[in-house]
Amino acid sequence: MSATTKLAIGMAAGVLLLTVAERRAQADSNEQYFPLQSYRVGPYAAGGSGFFGGFIDYMQLVNLRDNGVNGVKLTWSECETEYVVERGVECYERLKKGLNGAPTAATNPLSVGIAYATIDRQTVDKIPLITINHGRTDSTDGSVFPYIFPLQLNPYSEIAAIITWVGEKSGGLEKLKGKKIVTLYHGSPYGKETTPILDLYAKKYGFEITHIEVPHPGNEQQSQWLSIRRMKPDWVILRGWGVMNPVAIKTAAKTGFPVDHIIGNIWSNAEEDVRPAGSVGKGYIAITTGPSGTNFPVLKDIEKYVVKAGKGNLADAKRFGTIYYNLGVENGILNIEAVRVAQAKFGKRPLTGEEVRWGFEHLNIDDKRLKELGALGLLQPIKLSCSDHEGGGAVRFQQWNGDKWMTISDWVHPDRAVLRPIIEASAAKYAKEKGITPRNCSAEIHASLSR
């Protein structure tokens, strides 16, 4: 036997051993993996550390209290992005193949920029991309974006709810005519996402809209607020993030703009956004998809099984039950319920991203299930489908009393009759640009029902 032949046989044997080892690892693993593109340093650390802290603590709870999901333990690892797009993409590529044989369920980068940069990759890789309360609005249309899920609230629904509430405060939407509204937005894809829908509503209801950008990270806003003071708007919509939010509140107060006429969006609604502003933050208003507080059975279980066991993820225990932390818990519930739904169809085992995608698309969490989860009142009921990857769409308004958030409204729902055609048109344009043939959602639903 020649040396060349021996080398070829040796290489083939090596490849075979590697393949067998990989298959054995996958077979031996009884874990479901969540790669976490987290950020715990930098100007957005408060949001990242709170959110991922809540997400991780919920997964810990499911492992410690329930022995995982039907016996399948949850596992995860973090990759620090600092909210930088390039690092987020690097983290995705590094972690997407799973961990020690445990397959990847979904990614949750909590970053519009990172989400935009990985949409195409994750669609090809068949790994769900979860953008709770943010992301591309048109990814609501699952016929074009099968692997992207802007759960609970897309950016257009957020704006629609805010305009509806402002209209109610003005005596009706028709009373918005002649009003002045400013949107002060973070200079990023996230901040710019809602400009078109605000322009549409301004034209529809006759109010004057002015868009003012605050460059990243937002720690200097004097010129922007001086401009706002000159304009004398009736309302300011704050679409901030991280350090931009307390700076906005403090600068508004310095220039004499009333903080109770500033409405913070879904990423300008946390304790960390108002407490640094001190006493001048009292009266500030913001929207939320879920309240702060610990008076929920699921939070009490996390405290019992995770925190008191010394396995809590928060560096500062005082942040337990805050807006960012509770949103992480909400996100954990939605991710794990998707796994549970998918297991009911595909088996009680670790699942592929493609199988978990099916689980997300068939989520139907009603009040009964929320009560079973100990999360009734923590998050709104949510039902997803092939054509609707958002599912919720409602917000509540809250006001800072100087110490804590007080809910000041019931659920405010977006006008989907206005939004849906815009979403579908944008998704269709994207599909044409990318050469995507949209799924026939009606046919898929019919086929599913006929089985």
What spans do the regions from the language model cover?
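Short, low-complexity disordered leader/linker segments with a strong preference
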Residues: 1-33, 429-451
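Beta-alpha junction/loop-to-helix N-cap segments that form part of ligand/metal-binding clefts
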Residues: 29-33, 46-53, 60, 64-142, ...
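Venus flytrap/periplasmic-binding-protein-like
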Residues: 81, 129-131, 136-140, 217, ...
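Ligand-binding clamshell of periplasmic/extracellular solute-binding protein-like
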Residues: 81, 85, 103-116, 131-139, ...
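Extracellular/periplasmic Venus flytrap/periplasmic-binding protein
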Residues: 87, 97, 137-138, 146-255, ...
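Periplasmic-binding protein-like
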Residues: 95, 99-110, 128-132, 180-185, ...
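Extracellular/periplasmic periplasmic-binding protein-like sensory domains
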Residues: 145, 252-332, 411-415, 426
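Segments of small-molecule ligand-sensing domains
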Residues: 312-325, 336-410, 451
